[in-house]
């Protein structure tokens, strides 16, 4: 039987913006899950992932424009710890498959900035810490990890800003990228 766990990570920052706003807005993300408790895993956020959000450090326009296009910068580490798979059984889960999806334009490794009134020329990237591989958000990049019933499995990543290209200067504004992590396991 194949089971799927979906975890959403949002990387967001009030980047480059010191504007006074007369409008009050709020964003609410509602997530839920229905699972068979006897045949499921516990996925716990780690690192700087707090309530599905990684808050990046503010970067100035000059700092962002000085970066090479396609380079991850001003990073924050985060991850997921997967434990207690198939509770009450003799460790039938031996591996996990992780896939990440998100909105991209021309470069499948850069999440589009989806913030309203957002900065231009900049996006969000995610890199696996285990092998420094930049994650592709088009579903083509699948990572397989072993699973230990005694210690669980740590899925470790870093995320940060990415200058989209050298021809487009970075402008001020908020930055937001949303990545959906799907963790599959077999029972």
Q: What are these language model-derived features?
A:
Residues 1-22:
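Gram-negative bacterial Sec-dependent N-terminal signal peptides
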Residues 20-187:
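Mature extracellular/passenger domains of Gram-negative fimbrial/pilin and adhesin proteins
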């Amino acid at each position: 039987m194949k089971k799927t766990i979906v975890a959403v990570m949002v990387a967001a920052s009030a980047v480059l913006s010191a504007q006074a706003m007369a409008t009050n807005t709020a964003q609410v993300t509602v997530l839920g899950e229905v699972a068979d408790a006897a045949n499921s895993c516990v996925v716990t956020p780690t690192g700087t992932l707090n309530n599905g959000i990684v808050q990046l450090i503010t970067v100035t326009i000059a700092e962002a424009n000085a970066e090479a296009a396609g380079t991850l910068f001003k990073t924050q580490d985060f991850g997921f710890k997967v434990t207690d798979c198939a509770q009450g059984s003799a460790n039938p889960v031996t591996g996990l498959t992780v896939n990440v999806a998100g909105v991209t334009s021309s470069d499948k490794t850069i999440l589009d900035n989806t913030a309203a009134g957002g900065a231009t020329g900049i996006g969000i990237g995610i890199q696996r810490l285990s092998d420094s591989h930049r994650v592709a958000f088009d579903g083509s990049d699948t990572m397989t990890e072993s699973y230990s019933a005694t210690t669980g499995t740590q899925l470790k990543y870093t995320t940060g800003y990415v200058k989209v290209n050298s021809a487009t200067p970075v402008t001020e504004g908020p930055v937001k990228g949303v990545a959906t992590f799907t963790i599959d396991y077999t029972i």
